[in-house]
A protein has these predicted regions:
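Catalytic core of tubulin tyrosine ligase-like
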Residues: 6-10, 15-188
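Short beta-strand-to-loop acidic/aromatic patch adjacent to the donor-nucleotide binding site
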Residues: 1-4
Length: 188
C-alpha cells in the first residue's frame, strides 16, 4: 500500500514467515482510535482479517485490537499452486493467468462503495460526482479455508498508514517519522 510507511524487508519477519509454513503472513499493528480499514478478528472460529467494508456496523471495527498494515509475506509457489498456476505459466499464457485470477476472484466477496469523483475546472471550481466502486480485497484471502495464513504483530513503526492529514502529528511525534527517515537514508 502506498500509504503504509515503515514497511521494509525485515529479516526477522521473513524468518517468522518461512518457519510458519504459511502461504501468506500478514503484518498487523496495534490499533489506534483513528485507524480505519479493518483488522484481526475471529469469524466462525477462524482468525482472519476483517475489513471495515465487511463489518455489519461501521463502529464494529473500533473493537478490533490489531489493524491490518497491508504488508504481506508470500510463499510464491504455494500461492501459484492455489491459483492452479506455475512460475512458467506467468510468462507463457496471459489467458491462463487471467482465468486463474478470475476463478479465485469468484471465491471472494465483491464490495460496492460510493465515492466522490472530482472534476476540477476553472479557477477554484470543481464538480463532484458520486461513482460506484467495485472492490475485491486482498485481505479476504484470509477467509478462504484452503489458504494457510498467519499474522505477525509488528511495531506500529513498521505498519502505520497515513490516510489523512490529521495523522501527521502523531506520526511525527511517536518516532515513526525518524524510523521511516532512517529506512530511506534520510536521517540526520
Amino acid at each position: 500500500n502506498i500509504d503504509t510507511l515503515g514497511a521494509s524487508l525485515d529479516p526477522d519477519a521473513l524468518g517468522a514467515h518461512l518457519v510458519s509454513g504459511n502461504i501468506l503472513t500478514f503484518e498487523v499493528v496495534p490499533r489506534r482510535i483513528y485507524d480505519r480499514g479493518g483488522g484481526l478478528a475471529r469469524v466462525n472460529g477462524r482468525v482472519r482479517l476483517l475489513e471495515g467494508l465487511a463489518q455489519p456496523r461501521e463502529e464494529d471495527e473500533l473493537n478490533l485490537r490489531y489493524y491490518n498494515s497491508q504488508t504481506t509475506w508470500i510463499q510464491i509457489d504455494p500461492l501459484l499452486q492455489l491459483f492452479g498456476l506455475t512460475r512458467a505459466d506467468l510468462s507463457a499464457s496471459d489467458t491462463k493467468v487471467a482465468e486463474a485470477v478470475r476463478r479465485m476472484g469468484r471465491r471472494m466477496p465483491t464490495y460496492v462503495t460510493i465515492k466522490d469523483a472530482k472534476r476540477r475546472w476553472g479557477h477554484g471550481q470543481e464538480d463532484v460526482y458520486p461513482v460506484a466502486q467495485f472492490e475485491k480485497l486482498w485481505s479476504d484471502m484470509t477467509a478462504l479455508a484452503d489458504v494457510s495464513c498467519g499474522f505477525l504483530v509488528v511495531p506500529r513503526l513498521r505498519g502505520q498508514q497515513l490516510k489523512d492529514l490529521n495523522q501527521l502529528d502523531p506520526w511525527a511525534n511517536d518516532g515513526s517519522k525518524e524510523y521511516t527517515a532512517r529506512l530511506c537514508g534520510l536521517a540526520r
